[in-house]
């Protein structure tokens, strides 16, 4: 019912910001890294909102030494955020890898790429076998529950009955909470970072603003190539970035160097740079779909409400908030912790807003390290 393909791991150029991280262990051929694989589900995959796909693909990365029955290693599963990928060593380099907090030698570490992503898992940028062209808007709408179900297919394919530790930040946190409810006996311990359990009007407003930005690009609806909507994507990313960061963070990094300049531009050029940076590695159609999946987040839907759904979680949970997070204010994480039996709450101090979950590595390590199996 499945097949998989193994790819060699890639090493960034030595001049990248991750060069030191890779250099630390690349001198020894015996050190283990995460490798890229693909899971192909040959049955029909039915989507929650309707529609189906045959041959659903989920790209994932895992520790190089394969998981085996009766393996003594503990399983750590990482759920990534909106535009990240399954190569957690790439976007969380201080925490994932040999000798790091999530040690890919000591543990069997897995990270699956979300459905709808531009990094290989099935989504609007995938090729429709009926047309030989990308699906674009013919791909079914994706919910958080669809993403979790697809990830669970990978878990079953790997032969993993229990996930000893799960961690996710932002939309990765959505997945972690939802998974704890959908498969309550599977996840032993989890850390939910900077996330919510029901999409707020505030968050939906941001998502709609980004969709509007994409739709203003006339090439977006033409569906002529995956470069369609590129300028709209840059604008959407600029909008998103404001929600990810904070007033204090911008003030700490984006003041003009010339106090006498007539027209401030440093922060503006930074927004344009970040917009182009995303459009160089992502596509507008995947972004559009993933924003839609965020709007589906509601753990209480069909379960009697959010509080009742959270009350069914049997996973040992730690919830982490960030004091400067404007996208998911700490009130949301405190609420989550108050509804889950036995959950604990921690708060990170950061000037970087929501993105603090990617940057405040020392504080995260202090919280997570004592919880690891």
Per-range role (PLM):
Residues 313, 319-321:
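Short beta-strand/loop motif that positions the catalytic acidic residue
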Residues 303-306, 329-338:
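Short alpha-helix in the alpha/beta-hydrolase fold that links the catalytic acid
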Residues 134, 138, 145-164:
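Conserved acidic catalytic loop of the alpha/beta-hydrolase fold
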Residues 163-201:
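Conserved hydrolase catalytic core segment
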Residues 343-373:
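Catalytic active-site module of serine/aspartate enzymes centered on a nucleophile-bearing elbow/loop
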Residues 33-75:
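Catalytic-loop region of hydrolases
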Residues 61-129:
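N-terminal cap/lid subdomain of alpha/beta-hydrolase-fold enzymes
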Residues 186-188, 192-277:
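Alpha/beta-hydrolase-fold enzymes
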């Amino acid at each position: 019912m499945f097949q998989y393909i193994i790819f060699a791991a890639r090493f960034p150029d030595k001049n990248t910001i991750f060069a030191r991280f890779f250099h630390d262990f690349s001198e020894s051929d015996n050190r283990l890294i995460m490798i890229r694989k693909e899971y192909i589900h040959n049955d029909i995959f039915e989507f929650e909102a309707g529609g189906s796909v045959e041959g659903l693909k989920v790209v994932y990365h895992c520790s190089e030494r394969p998981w085996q029955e009766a393996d003594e290693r503990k399983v750590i599963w990482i759920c990534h955020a909106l535009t990240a990928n399954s190569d957690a060593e790439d976007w969380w380099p201080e925490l994932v890898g040999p000798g790091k907090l999530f040690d890919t030698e000591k543990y069997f570490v897995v990270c699956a790429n979300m459905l709808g992503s531009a990094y290989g898992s099935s989504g609007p940028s995938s090729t429709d076998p009926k047309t030989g062209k990308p699906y674009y808007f013919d791909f079914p709408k994706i919910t958080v529950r669809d993403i979790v179900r697809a990830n669970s297919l990978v878990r079953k394919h790997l032969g993993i009955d229990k996930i000893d530790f799960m961690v996710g930040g932002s939309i990765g946190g959505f997945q972690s909470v939802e998974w704890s409810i959908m498969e309550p006996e599977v996840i032993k311990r989890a850390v939910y970072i900077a996330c919510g359990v029901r999409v707020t009007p505030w968050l939906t407003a941001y998502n709609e603003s980004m969709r509007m930005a994409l739709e203003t690009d006339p090439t977006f609806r033409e569906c002529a190539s995956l470069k369609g909507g590129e300028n709209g994507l840059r604008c959407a990313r600029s909008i998103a970035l404001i929600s990810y960061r904070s007033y204090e963070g911008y003030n700490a990094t984006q003041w003009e160097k010339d106090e006498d300049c007539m027209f401030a531009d440093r922060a503006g050029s930074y927004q344009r740079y970040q917009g182009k940076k995303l459009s160089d590695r992502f596509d507008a159609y995947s972004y559009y779909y993933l924003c839609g999946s965020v709007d589906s987040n509601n753990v209480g839907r069909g379960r009697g409400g959010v509080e009742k759904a959270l009350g069914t979680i049997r996973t040992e949970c730690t919830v982490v908030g960030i004091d400067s997070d404007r996208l998911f204010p700490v009130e949301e994480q405190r609420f989550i912790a108050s509804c889950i039996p036995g959950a604990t709450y921690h708060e990170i101090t950061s000037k970087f807003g929501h993105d603090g979950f990617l940057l405040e590595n020392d504080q995260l390590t202090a919280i997570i390290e004592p919880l690891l199996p």
